Every structure is written in C-alpha cells, then in structure tokens.
Amino acid sequence: MSIIDNRKAHFDYHIEERYEAGLVLEGWEVKALRAGRGQIREGYVVIKHDEIFLIGTHISPLPEASTHITPDPVRTRKLLLHREEIKKLIGKVEQRGYTLVPLNFHYKGGRVKCDIALAKGKKLHDKRETEKKRDWEREKARIMRAGT
C-alpha cells in the first residue's frame, strides 16, 4: 500500500528501471508519514561517495512532536540499497540523460520503503503526446459506455 505517490514522475520522465530502497528515518518522520504528512513531488535522488541520498522531500512534523528535538522537514535522507545495485545505478546515471527519481513511499514488513526509478527526462512534445493519448483513452471509454 502506497503512502505517498509522485504522480508527476510518469508525466515528466520515461521510467526504465525500478528499485526498492530502504529509508533512514527518524521516529517523528515515521509518525508523520503514518498520518500522511509527506510530499515527494519536488524530491530527487543524488549519488555522493558511493551512497544514495533523497533530497527535497518534505515530511511535515506532527503538531504534537516532541519538544526536545527540532524537526527539519526537508532534510537529506539516506537511501539503503545493495552495493551491486548502487554500482549499477552509478554506471547508468553517469550516462548522458539518465536520472534517479522517487516514485512513492510504501510499507513493507512494517518498514517505510521508497521506490526509485532510473529514468530519462521527457521533452515537451513527448509530454504533449502522453496527454493526447490519455485524452483519447478517456474519450474512447466514454464512447464505449454511451454505446452500451
């Protein structure tokens, strides 16, 4: 079950490969995610020193968060992947045009996981084409319903 989805990712990028990564979170972040207080639309993934980090995601702290900590809603969060997967991703991202984007947060075995995708950015005409296809599918479904 998905906690947060990045709906714009499929519109802005051609998704080529998907990976499931663990997230290093603090306790207040897990509680906030359970309450649905997160956003990954502006998030992106970077590779630094053979480690993968999630930057730009916003997790709003709950109002009843502890007073002895100072929550940072947009802090950099480390992603956990196997070393072989990281090496493969480093090789792909170094190729021109590839990037890593977060797709969603979900639970697996009581832990919060992040689906990330190896993707290529879409050009403007690709986005328009995707929108035309979606509109045509919607219109086709409407015609089929009206016909029966």
UniProtKB/Swiss-Prot annotation:
SUPFAM superfamilies: Small protein B (SmpB). GO terms for molecular function: RNA binding. Its main location: cytoplasm. InterPro entries: SmpB (IPR023620), SsrA-bd_prot (IPR000037), SsrA-bd_prot_CS (IPR020081). It is found in: Cytoplasm. PANTHER family: SSRA-BINDING PROTEIN (PTHR30308:SF2), TMRNA-BINDING COMPONENT OF TRANS-TRANSLATION TAGGING COMPLEX (PTHR30308). This is SsrA-binding protein. It comes from Burkholderia lata (strain ATCC 17760 / DSM 23089 / LMG 22485 / NCIMB 9086 / R18194 / 383). The gene is smpB.
